[in-house]
């Protein structure tokens, strides 16, 4: 269990309240597939993801980005039980999809870049980023729990 201060909880929930999952999710997943091209192998059912232009125009990438952000919303709503919130998803990514857990860190980084670009230094202050990174680290850790 992660120990959250009241200030961290407030920063995470406030930032989350400003995030448009339909904007940030597709941007973050698109960025992941472009910046870390080896992750494309996990998305073969999405059709063409072989070029930057194909990724940018792929509606399945955009939809899955929204799905990912919906999963993050579950963590925001369950800050005190992130590990159990992600147990089933961790098992699926480990046993069925065989996703390298380092990819979760890469996606978290892409989400942070997109959030920082969207909100800038006025809203995404160092204090907010500190809480946000702690939150994403907890999510990444929870997603990696079921790996052998």
From Swiss-Prot:
GO molecular function, one term: haptoglobin binding
Domain of life: Eukaryota
Globin domain: residues covered: 3-148
SUPFAM superfamilies with a match to the protein in the record: Globin-like
Keyword Transport recorded: yes
Alphabetically ordered keywords of this record: Heme, Iron, Metal-binding, Oxygen transport, Transport
Pfam family, one: Globin
Residues the entry annotates as binding heme b: 64, 93
Keyword Ubl conjugation in record: no
PANTHER family attached to this UniProt entry: HEMOGLOBIN FAMILY MEMBER, HEMOGLOBIN SUBUNIT BETA-1-RELATED
Subunit comment: Heterotetramer of two alpha chains and two beta chains.
Family of the protein in this entry: Belongs to the globin family.
Stated name of the protein: Hemoglobin subunit beta-B
Species name: Seriola quinqueradiata (Five-ray yellowtail)
